[in-house]
Amino acid sequence: WTLSLLLGAVVGNEVCYERLGCFSDDSPWAGIVERPLKILPWSPEKVNTRFLLYTNENPDNFQEIVADPSTIQSSNFNTGRKTRFIIHGFIDKGEESWLSTMCQNMFKVESVNCICVDWKSGSRTAYSQASQNVRIVGAEVAYLVGVLQSSFDYSPSNVHIIGHSLGSHAAGEAGRRTNGAVGRITGLDPAEPCFQGTPELVRLDPSDAQFVDVIHTDIAPFIPNLGFGMSQTAGHLDFFPNGGKEMPGCQKNVLSQIVDIDGIWQGTRDFAACNHLRSYKYYTDSILNPDGFAGFSCASYSDFTANKCFPCSSEGCPQMGHYADRFPGRTKGVGQLFYLNTGDASNFARWRYRVDVTLSGKKVTGHVLVSLFGNKGNSRQYEIFQGTLKPDNTYSNEFDSDVEVGDLEKVKFIWYNNVINLTLPKVGASKITVERNDGSVFNFCSEETVREDVLLTLTAC
């Protein structure tokens, strides 16, 4: 009897394991519209969840620990530090470079136990099976958190679980099994198929931790667009960078992003659409850019792009990614929506500014550009307006700078004519007002006018 319990006794549609308890294929886990197949998760042995510990003392080479006090004791695990788990998704693996890179960025800003969770044995199978196997992964993480609590008096509130794709729902399962006592869960583009629209029991939801934040980067419907991420909210704070569908720098041709099947089985990271992978790249970048991912409270991305959501509210803007937990209103509601834009390449951080330009000089047709100069850096030129330029009229725009300029010291104005004008008209900016996302306002003035393609420098009024 004991042996059969250890091996996993299948009784009807339920399977039980000594450490992890029982798993059934009853509703809502299976046999519902979103997951019609009656499938049980694989055994813990077959899923083979592994815990790869990186710390500030061993940033480059992991120590493998198990949920046993002796291996934890003999490792560099430090009970005086926070612990952040990182759980990969479908077809991925815990040794993939993005997980250890995320840990290494953390070590640049904090002392932390960073545990990469490898479950490649359970993720490299049919998607419908992998989506059940995350229940085992979540149970294993919860079991380890329980051992830390019982053997080392380590509080679950010091635990942060970061999950990508299917890993987001494994994180949710781990949190559910600790009755929401885990301090924080971050969902990085939680997987849509088999999870969107299911009961909260099955998927990541705000009750799974004291604080849940989610980054959505691939919310186009799976059919027909092959969008892998959930569009529904799943946290206290839900961030939709670039609107959540098309990430800058990702090609729109879906087929070009799907590698050949042999590549998939070699464990390549690019098994899926570029958009889906952007979520963990944004998070990794956010660790080293504490204020470069401000999210703006907004009803929709179209409102955000129409400049209706600037500046931040009186309590500020939450930062998407690593520092989302610094936001004062982080748990005042669930499904709070935030929008922002990011860059398109490796440096994803952006700083949003609003600029108002009051013109002087002649009435002409053309476009106006402004560049910002501050104590932290200088921006490139950004277009504020294009069309008929009228003196004494004020033109406004918002833009996302790839440079944080800090406190503004001066601005430069330039204008271009759209048509050849033999009268060589002159245009100036009598006043330029720059507002940062924190509501700080800087005013600059000039009485000069300039011909087209000539820079005009404005200093503080």
UniProtKB/Swiss-Prot annotation:
GO cellular component: extracellular space
A molecular function GO annotation: triacylglycerol lipase activity
EC number from the UniProt entry: 3.1.1.3
Record keywords: Calcium, Disulfide bond, Hydrolase, Lipid degradation, Lipid metabolism, Metal-binding, Secreted, Signal
Ranges for domain PLAT: 351-461
Disulfide cross-links: 16-22, 103-114, 250-274, 298-309, 312-317, 445-461
Family matches, as PROSITE patterns: LIPASE_SER, PLAT
Active-site residues annotated for this sequence: 165, 189, 276
InterPro entries linked to this entry: AB_hydrolase_fold (IPR029058), Lipase (IPR013818), Lipase_LIPH (IPR016272), Lipase_N (IPR033906), Lipase_panc (IPR002331), PLAT/LH2_dom (IPR001024), PLAT/LH2_dom_sf (IPR036392), TAG_lipase (IPR000734)
Family matches, as SUPFAM superfamilies: alpha/beta-Hydrolases (SSF53474), Lipase/lipooxygenase domain (PLAT/LH2 domain) (SSF49723)
UniProt-listed GO biological process terms: cholesterol homeostasis; fatty acid biosynthetic process; high-density lipoprotein particle remodeling; triglyceride catabolic process
Name of the featured protein: Pancreatic triacylglycerol lipase
Organism of derivation: Equus caballus (Horse)
